[in-house]
Amino acid sequence: MPSSISWGLLLLAALSCLGPGSLAQDAQETEASKQDQEHPASHKIAPHLAEFALSFYRVLARQSNTTNIFFSPVSIATALAMLSLGTKGDTHTQILEGLDFNLTEMAEADIHQGFQHLLQTLNRPNTQLQLTSGNGLFIDRNLKLLDKFLEDVKSLYHSEAFSTNFTNTEEARQQINSYVEKGTKGKIVELLKELDRDTVLALVNYIFFKGKWKQPFNEEQTREKDFHVDEATTVRVPMMNRLGMFHLHHCSTLASWVLQMDYLGNATAIFLLPDKGKMRHLEDTVTTEILTKFLKNRETTKSQLYFPKVSISGTYDLKDVLSSLGITKVFSSEADLSGVTEEAPLTVSKALHKAVLDIDEEGTEAAGGTVLGNIRSILRYEVIFDRPFLVVIYEHHTKSPLFVGKVVNPTQQ
């Protein structure tokens, strides 16, 4: 039996609408949010996901300060936690500690129950927010997995299992890519360009997000303007603009403008625009505590906002990044995945992650302009997002960071 495991990770964020948010939360508390308060399993893992997100981001930022960054910490962590169910020894410890979990402070059962609740919440039907996540387990038809591993990934991570003919690599590649394309509504195609010949198992995670802003920009107001990629490079981008009430303030600690935009439903995007020359300071200074404080304490001001339309993507081979976070053994010949199968020693030969982010003017109602047109308060700020900035998208019910990124060039795919 071939002795390697090929692991593919996938994410999609399709953010099709952008607009100013509202300070007030939805007036009526839904049954879903009540259940989340009563069963806060995902809340226990949320701080660790946030720390993992920033650690992962900083590794990517150190690798290059001239390219866009976009990934889903939830997607990556879910796949790693699911894989950990079949690992033992140092391989097992490295994965969970790499995800910022302290096994002396949190029971492993609580970790997996947290992910179980997270996935249940993300996949709950919502008429206002399209948010779905899926885990696929593609198993060579000749490979016998241990019953406990198969039962756990299905019950805790809602994973689908597919019998796959990995001896025909092209057929297997197409099967996996079709699963991903369907799950991401056609936004990500051909995730796997090739498949190793000794692959016997593939773990695939995807997430699809499409949100509408509570109050959209007016498309007729969008104009071509300069975006300063760096001191020497300027590109022309469609720049949206709007006069209205925004959750916007300047944070002296981060030397950055902080803008929060609410989606219809239960998600918020935080955009961090550093002062000129302060991107490295922002990246080194921002913490999960600061971001949480922003979400809890929001001020509303009348402002003129200019924001670029964005269409970017990120594709990553995760080996190098995860190795920098201490997750190394699972990729080596010393990997212990004996909890997956007893038939042969396995190692992870491939770890892929892809994310796509689209932002434009669209919203649910054009009436937002009328409401904002009646605001008579004094204009306080004029802020132009015409240079690189960070973005973090949170899901409120689980208190988890769905996506993290840096927009260096809004037009660069």
From Swiss-Prot:
Secretion signal, residue range per the UniProt entry: 1-24
- Which molecular function term from Gene Ontology is one that the record holds? serine-type endopeptidase inhibitor activity
Tell me which tissues or organs this protein is expressed in: Expressed in liver.
What residues bear carbohydrate chains? 65, 102, 165, 266
Task: Establish whether keyword Signal is in the entry.
Answer: yes
**Coiled-coil intervals in this record?**
none
- Where are the annotated segments for RCL? 368-387
Matching InterPro entries: Serpin_CS, Serpin_dom, Serpin_fam, Serpin_sf, Serpin_sf_1, Serpin_sf_2
A Pfam family hit: Serpin
Query: Record's Gene Ontology CC terms?
Result: extracellular space
- Keywords assigned: Glycoprotein, Protease inhibitor, Pyrrolidone carboxylic acid, Serine protease inhibitor, Signal
In-chain residues carrying the UniProt-annotated modification Pyrrolidone carboxylic acid? 25
Task: Give site residues, Reactive bond.
Answer: 377-378
* Record bears the keyword Nuclease: no
Q: Which family does it belong to?
A: Belongs to the serpin family.
- Domains (record comment): The reactive center loop (RCL) extends out from the body of the protein and directs binding to the target protease. The protease cleaves the serpin at the reactive site within the RCL, establishing a covalent linkage between the serpin reactive site and the active site of the protease. The resulting inactive serpin-protease complex is highly stable.
Q: Output the PANTHER family linked to this UniProt entry.
A: ALPHA-1-ANTITRYPSIN (PTHR11461:SF165), SERINE PROTEASE INHIBITOR, SERPIN (PTHR11461)
Name the record gives this protein: Alpha-1-antitrypsin-like protein CM55-SI
